[in-house]
Amino acid sequence: MLPNMQIIHYLSARKLKFMEEVKVIEIKKSIFEENGREADELRAELKKKGVFLLNLMSSPGSGKTTTLIATINAIKDKIKVAVMEADIDSDVDAIKIKEATGIESIQLHTGGMCHLDAEMTRQGLDNLSEGLDLAILENVGNLVCPAEFDTGAVRNAMILSVPEGHDKPLKYPLMFSICDVVLINKT
């Protein structure tokens, strides 16, 4: 046997010996597992209350807030709607929504995080008035992180603006695969 083969044989035999003496526990748990449970619970609670939660995502500057203002003004006399604005630190969009529509609009500061998860969404919902028909979560402007975290929303939507380029579905496939609706803006 070659010297290197002897070393490999020795190490393999040693590993087998220790494997018999040491109990090995394989832990294969998704880091998203707990959030998934929380999101499912939140969806069930919202369904009981008759609240439809929409998670709106896109990159910064695609027109989320402007589109929301136009949509809210078209529906606010028919249903009770409120908005949760998520941003790393700013409250500009929450103020803009409130001033332009007159509806309830709250700001969720993520403290540097580029997404919201189910627990963060719940905190926002707990601060909205009762009796809503529609709660809209305007997620942090980003095409990567928000797609990875289930917020507990009934539906996910995104806005894609034409100036961003035609390659976004290729660069960010997860975002496009989890969305129920994609709005094309700035055509």
Question: Model features per residue range: what roles?
Answer:
Residues S58:
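The Walker A (P-loop) glycine that initiates the GxxxxGKT/S ATP-binding motif of P-loop NTPases
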Residues T151-G152, L174-I178:
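Short, conserved loop/helix-junction motifs that constitute active-site signature segments
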Residues P3-Y10, K15:
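Short, positively charged and aromatic/hydrophobic N-terminal segments
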Residues E21-A44, K49-L54, S62, T66, ...:
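Nucleotide-state-sensitive switch-loop elements of NTP-binding domains
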